[in-house]
Each structure stands twice: as C-alpha cells, then as structure tokens.
UniProtKB/Swiss-Prot annotation:
Highest classification ranks of the organism: Archaea, Nanobdellota, Candidatus Nanoarchaeia, Nanoarchaeales, Nanoarchaeaceae
Protein name (Swiss-Prot/TrEMBL): Small ribosomal subunit protein uS11
Pfam families recorded: Ribosomal_S11
Organism per entry: Nanoarchaeum equitans (strain Kin4-M)
Superkingdom of source: Archaea
Gene name of the record: rps11
Family: Belongs to the universal ribosomal protein uS11 family.
Length: 130
C-alpha cells in the first residue's frame, strides 16, 4: 500500500467569496488553489455553496493529481475587530465536497482571527443608531 501524503486545506469563507488553498503539511508550498470567482461568471454568485462545491472539486482534483491522500482543514471567516466571526455559506459545502472527492479528512480547525480588545469598533460612543 502506498504511503499516505497529507496536506492542509485553508478554507477562507466570507459572504462574498470562498477560497480553498491546499498546501503541504508545513504550509510553505502551494499544491492547489480554487475560489468561487474562478468557477462562476457573476460576482453575486461567488459566495454561494454551489461555487464553493465547484472550487473544492477543482482544488481536490489538482491535489490528488499531485499525490495528496488526506487533508487537515483550517476554516477561516473574515474576523478581526470589524468582520463577522462566522464563516460564509460556502465553508461547509467545501468541506463536504473535499470528503466526497475521496480525500481523507483529519483535523477540522477554526482559525478565524479574534480581537483581544485591540482596536475600537467604529460607531462612536453610543453605537450605530439604525
């Protein structure tokens, strides 16, 4: 039986786009990249689960071609002191697709940047009044 070769799938998912970046285990060498904008024509569809599925299929095919058999997954939302800390609609669709394409899934980890009370949010003393 051939030796397993693991990689890391960095999935960045916002409301507007989903980017799947597969690297080697160290994160230094890029193996495959796919994004919503690479597979759909309309800008409004880039963040959809359908675009994430197509991007994940494309990235998985390139990764399997280069000998990757399993993936550890790192999911990231925009985060920071301004953005949402919840991944967009394409994140779960991308993970499911990578599993369906025959790649083994190891660890699924959330790596969204969270503020530790650094910058002040915009909106003033009394907050945003709607």
């Amino acid at each position: 039986m051939a030796k397993e070769r693991w990689g890391v799938a960095h999935i960045y998912s916002s409301e507007n786009n989903t980017i799947i970046h597969i690297t080697d285990i160290t994160g230094a060498e890029t193996i495959a990249v796919g994004s919503g904008g690479m597979v759909v024509n309309a800008d409004r569809l880039e963040g959809s689960p359908t675009a994430a599925i197509l991007a994940a299929k494309r990235a998985a095919a390139l990764a399997k071609e280069r000998g990757i058999t399993g993936l550890h997954i790192k999911v990231r939302a925009p985060g920071g002191h301004n953005g949402p800390w919840i991944p967009g609609p394409g994140a779960s669709a991308a993970i499911k697709t990578l599993a369906r394409e025959g790649l083994k899934i190891g660890i699924i980890e959330d790596v969204t940047p969270t503020p530790h009370d650094g910058c002040r949010r915009k909106g003033g003393k009394r907050g945003r009044r709607v």
